């Protein structure tokens, strides 16, 4: 109960001291929130930013959301009565879809997810042609990032079209059979072009290639010494063109499948597909607090993303100059605000931002000091 009351009071302090970051056309968005007591409340609507900020000051949310969709009547309870007018294209990237994340620390998770965000941004900008102004990037306040595409090109897309985009980014249909068929078109951009270059790079290094063959590699490598159309097969595999896909043998297919798995590990982006396909999705409100960490949902300039550290930039100013006592059941280590904390089980005095993180993540509890 102490942790509940303190968290509520500190979140209330935050909302009294800070402004939310308003999405466009806020009057057309459905608003929802989870209070500190009770279940989610949704189908709310506000005419402008003053109304919603007044609301959150009176009703402190643990989590605050808004719809990626635009509606004529956003406060209607039944979806068909809201009258859908379009939706942003949303991508959610967090630890839930990262292999091995259950064995990572919080900081390791953030770094790993960041790699996938960079891959996603590369797809959106270089493959789909969205400009920087059309892409809104936010640290979620939790274990990842949200990417919003705000463009006339996406508003009217239905769930199936959004699923195709998601599959492209996750390389769901990127199989050797499909690659061989698509190579006839000789694409000049996209994953197939990159995969073709990747194959050429690997076949140009015998020791590197050896990693991708299961069996007698010397025998396989000798098979590449034969001539095809006046050229050695190994030379064709090394060339940066699509001719290689016309001459692959079964043994080559085994190698290419192994290379493809490695390629996907390095270049696909692990997104939460149901979020992308949902044209009515509620997403975290920019500038709100994440109820499990006390960190803010923070906008990130995509040109400065490489240097962005959420454990500095997403820490609210109002939590930086206060301290609290927390009790931990086990030792815990984390670096926040460029300070490394090595906490022992038992009572610890820590900065308020860390106390809210520890209690929100159920790592510790507030202690009432008299």
UniProtKB/Swiss-Prot annotation:
GO terms for cellular component: DNA-directed RNA polymerase complex; primosome complex. Its cofactor is Mg(2+); Mn(2+). The keyword Manganese applies. NCBIfam families: primase_sml, PRK00419.1-3. GO terms for molecular function: DNA-directed RNA polymerase activity; metal ion binding. This is DNA primase small subunit PriS. Catalytic subunit of DNA primase, an RNA polymerase that catalyzes the synthesis of short RNA molecules used as primers for DNA polymerase during DNA replication. The small subunit contains the primase catalytic core and has DNA synthesis activity on its own. Binding to the large subunit stabilizes and modulates the activity, increasing the rate of DNA synthesis while decreasing the length of the DNA fragments, and conferring RNA synthesis capability. The DNA polymerase activity may enable DNA primase to also catalyze primer extension after primer synthesis. May also play a role in DNA repair. Heterodimer of a small subunit (PriS) and a large subunit (PriL). The active site is at residues 92, 94, 272. Keywords: DNA replication, DNA-directed RNA polymerase, Magnesium, Manganese, Metal-binding, Nucleotidyltransferase, Primosome, Transcription, Transferase. One of its GO terms (biological process) is DNA replication, synthesis of primer. The keyword Transcription regulation does not apply. PANTHER family: DNA PRIMASE SMALL SUBUNIT (PTHR10536). It comes from Picrophilus torridus (strain ATCC 700027 / DSM 9790 / JCM 10055 / NBRC 100828 / KAW 2/3). InterPro entries: DNA_primase_S, DNA_primase_ssu_euk/arc, DNA_primase_ssu_PriS. It comes from the Archaea. It is an enzyme of class 2 (transferase). Belongs to the eukaryotic-type primase small subunit family. Its EC number is 2.7.7.-.
